[in-house]
């Protein structure tokens, strides 16, 4: 999926109902955030955190409330999604510790190195493997030596039987989340067309090639897997 397509998908209509749409499967997000917080919990009290593809800001909000001394930079190309993120931060009284950058990582002005970066369900939209490696390299360039990357993406073993079985469970879960059959069918088509759903070892190799040590997988919830790695 190219940049224009991504911005068309995550438009004003999407942003206004995004959090509500996924509220029924919030336990997946909550488990991810709980473990992300554990991975990063030893950072300094005034750590700087880069949130790449911040969307409506769920991980930023969670981490900012859990770690009241941390400072955040949210990078998000969709203006409507970033507006929701900013509004939520203002409502919770944490906006003073946040910067909001509309655009991509390469357009973020140079600044102090970050202690950690999050990229949750972002790199999966980069279908070209070289571009995906470059995405992680861009994050590594913003981190201090030894800084953490926490990354989550849709990922699955690609043996036909295992993948189809897990995929079936995934869509049945979406039905329980009250998505309409039409919405689920659109999701199926998008996964086939617009998501680079790769085996976990391949995703780990791409992260390493982007300037990180060997990633450690710390979570799997259905098709979502998450890793942490450190900049080398």
Where do the language-model regions lie?
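Conserved class I S-adenosyl-L-methionine
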Residues: 1-44, 148-176
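Class I SAM-dependent methyltransferase SAM/SAH-binding core
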Residues: 48-52, 56-107
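A short acidic, Gly/Pro-enriched loop at the edge of an enzyme's catalytic core
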Residues: 109-117
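A short beta-strand submotif of the Rossmann-like class I SAM-dependent methyltransferase core
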Residues: 119-123
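A short glycine-rich, Lys/Arg-flanked "PGG" loop and its adjoining helix->strand segment in the class I
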Residues: 133-145
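Short alpha-helix
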Residues: 193-210
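Core SAM-dependent methyltransferase catalytic element
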Residues: 210-232
């Amino acid at each position: 999926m190219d940049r224009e397509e991504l911005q068309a998908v995550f438009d004003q209509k999407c942003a206004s109902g995004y959090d509500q749409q996924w509220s029924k499967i919030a336990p997946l997000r909550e488990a991810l955030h709980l473990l992300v917080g554990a991975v990063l919990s030893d950072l300094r009290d005034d750590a700087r955190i880069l949130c790449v593809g911040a969307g409506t800001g769920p991980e930023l909000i969670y981490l900012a409330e859990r770690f009241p001394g941390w400072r955040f930079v949210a990078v998000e190309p969709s203006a409507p999604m970033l507006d929701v993120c900013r509004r939520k931060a203002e409502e919770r009284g944490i906006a003073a510790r946040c910067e909001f950058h509309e655009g991509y990582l390469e357009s973020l002005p140079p600044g102090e190195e970050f202690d950690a970066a999050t990229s949750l369900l972002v790199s999966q939209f980069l279908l070209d493997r070289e571009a995906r490696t470059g995405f992680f390299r861009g994050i590594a360039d913003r981190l201090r030596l030894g800084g953490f990357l926490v990354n989550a993406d849709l990922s699955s073993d690609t043996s036909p039987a295992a993948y189809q079985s897990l995929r079936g469970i995934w869509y049945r879960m979406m039905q329980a989340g009250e998505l309409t059959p039409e919405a689920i069918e659109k999701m199926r088509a998008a996964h086939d067309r617009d998501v680079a759903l790769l085996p976990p070892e391949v995703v780990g190799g791409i992260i390493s090639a982007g300037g990180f040590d060997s990633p450690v997988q710390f979570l799997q919830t259905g098709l979502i897997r998450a890793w942490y790695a450190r900049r080398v």
